[in-house]
Curated annotation (Swiss-Prot):
Major localization class: other
Keywords: Acetylation, FAD, Fatty acid metabolism, Flavoprotein, Lipid metabolism, Oxidoreductase, Peroxisome, Phosphoprotein
Protein name per its UniProtKB record: Peroxisomal acyl-coenzyme A oxidase 2
GO MF annotations in UniProt: 3alpha,7alpha,12alpha-trihydroxy-5beta-cholestanoyl-CoA 24-hydroxylase activity; acyl-CoA oxidase activity; FAD binding; fatty acid binding; flavin adenine dinucleotide binding; protein homodimerization activity
Matching Gene3D superfamilies: Acyl-CoA dehydrogenase/oxidase, N-terminal domain, Butyryl-CoA Dehydrogenase, subunit A, domain 2, Butyryl-CoA Dehydrogenase, subunit A, domain 3
UniProt GO cellular component terms: cytosol; peroxisome
TM region(s), chain numbering: none
GO biological process: bile acid biosynthetic process; fatty acid beta-oxidation using acyl-CoA oxidase
Short sequence motif Microbody targeting signal: positions: 679-681
Family as reported in the entry's similarity comment: Belongs to the acyl-CoA oxidase family.
Catalysed reactions, semicolon-separated: (25R)-3alpha,7alpha,12alpha-trihydroxy-5beta-cholestan-26-oyl-CoA + A + H2O = (24R,25R)-3alpha,7alpha,12alpha,24-tetrahydroxy-5beta-cholestan-26-oyl-CoA + AH2; (25S)-3alpha,7alpha,12alpha-trihydroxy-5beta-cholestan-26-oyl-CoA + O2 = (24E)-3alpha,7alpha,12alpha-trihydroxy-5beta-cholest-24-en-26-oyl-CoA + H2O2
E.C. numbers: 1.17.99.3
Cellular localisation: Peroxisome
Organism name: Mus musculus
Amino acid sequence: MGNPGDRVSLGETWSREVHPDIDSERHSPSFSVERLTNILDGGIPNTELRRRVESLIQRDPVFNLKHLYFMTRDELYEDAVQKRFHLEKLAWSLGWSEDGPERIYADRVLAGYNNLNLHGIAMNAIRSLGSDEQIAKWGQLGKNFQIITTYAQTELGHGTYLQGLETEATYDATTQEFVIHSPTMTSIKWWPGDLGRTVTHAVVLAHLICLGARHGMHAFIVPIRSLEDHTPLPGITVGDIGPKMGFENIDNGFLRLNHVRVPRENMLSRFAEVLPDGTYQRLGTPQSNYLGMLVTRVQLLYKGFLPTLQKACTIAVRYAVIRHQSRLRPSDPEAKILEYQTQQQKLLPQLAVSYALHFMTTSLLQFFHSSYSDILKRDFSLLPELHALSTGMKAMSSDFCAQGTEICRRACGGHGYSKLSGLPTLVTQAIASCTYEGENTVLYLQVARFLMKSYLQAQVSPGSIPQKPLPQSVMYLATPRPARCPAQTAADFRCPEVYTTAWAYVSARLIRDATQHTQTLMRSGVDQYDAWNQTSVIHLQAAKAHCYFLTVRNFKEAVEKLDNEPEIQRVLQNLCDLYALNGILTNSGDFLHDGFLSGAQVDMARTAFLDLLPLIRKDAILLTDAFDFSDHCLNSALGCYDGHVYQRLFEWAQKSPANTQENPAYKKYIRPLMQSWKPKL
């Protein structure tokens, strides 16, 4: 499990002893926390490397996080830029590779607190969409920070709907340049991170126009600021968009382009190029230009969304064994709030979601790495499935993380509202993830289109026409299933085969219903686009069920592979059961709709769910310890490893500048008002 002393890293001298209420939770563990940590990390070497990197970060005073809660917006920005460049110097000195695990582990500690993350996203876009020559040129400049880049896609008037973007790139054959222009107010690029005050270049998404013909969205490298004095270049209007709900350290910006010229070579050209005379040549599918977004979404799953919920669970569960409230019996002392079933019902499903998403993300990463190299070689056969999986998992993961972090915050009562708990920061980070890199409803509907096509493909009679095999993730659509659930007792609902089959049945039924509703409208004469719009709510429901089914099935399969770890397999099986049953109870109407489940069976599922809560509660602290977040990484007064919540809250509050600075409002307003009443007293 590592050295517990390494986890208590915030410097309080009184924190060398662990609070007995949390210490008792770690006595006589039912499984090896250290071994589960190794499994989550993908092996002992990864755990050891991650801890070395985290220890390096935590010992460096530049990476101190404690003071951030008391900083102004400008101070947060400057501090985050300093952290990023200090990290780069550290990486260079230690020989870390650009895409190596060390940087991922460093980001795990500093997540949300270091700037220039969009520089990495823009570099990924260049590596995904650029030619070998462009990668050699721009990749090296970006790696050395000779240029600083952002990815400029979203506009004031459009975001997820890429075809609606208005920025134009018109090719001028006489000069062999592209003229990049924002033709309307709504075409101003809006929201790109680091654009407001920092970057020198942007990867700009714009509609390509050649010889009067439009060829869809393409990516262009556009200089934004002078490399000499950082002033905006001619034709560039750029700035900061102002305060936001969160991420106040990041200078999200706007960019207006007024006929800005860039060389022909600045269009990223792995999958399409414009010849000197203006002839357009496509070298891939139209969807291949979205590959940069796909890479970003996959990375966000394990670098952004998942750690946010894992941290929130760790904080809330630890606080729940320190906080005592009311009595279970009149003669008892006040109980830990985690003893209450209602608190377990709030927190333990979030813990189950954290583990379910971990194994789903691991599986998706494996599929991504196996197919990405083929896509770069212009083999696009797996691109539709990879797009559907990454899009669906982005939507579901960010939705669940946003919901889960807020549930964890509320479960901590009033103290959860304090920034010192660390939870408000996690909540605002998670909420933002539901709309950046694609608004989730739109993303679910993209998945739904893939599902409708797959369902129709699955219904084609064998041998009638040449048929491509169904993608692996939707092969279940062609598999017959019983029309009724066979479960007869609550214990039956703890059988993975029972609930996995139930989820497969309901997902397939919803996909079928959505498709048939759309087709019925079209047969009645409704235009296909109107028919889609009029059934989009049903399609949305089907896409969500499909994504949930995939995580249930994947979690089940991941647990089955742990036969050589029986203690860990047991506790993870409980979490898998809880995840599947919580989804069934939350969406019980879908399972009752056509009688697949009866009302009595839903009651059985609820009994099975409630029976799981005390079993998982016994291991809850150990399951959060297995995430192996240090105190530095959590930056939470409520969630520290030692459990000294109240001392830490009080000590941190003393650091507020309001406690040491003179109160100007007293002289200006309070004292004059109070003195005006003196003669009357």
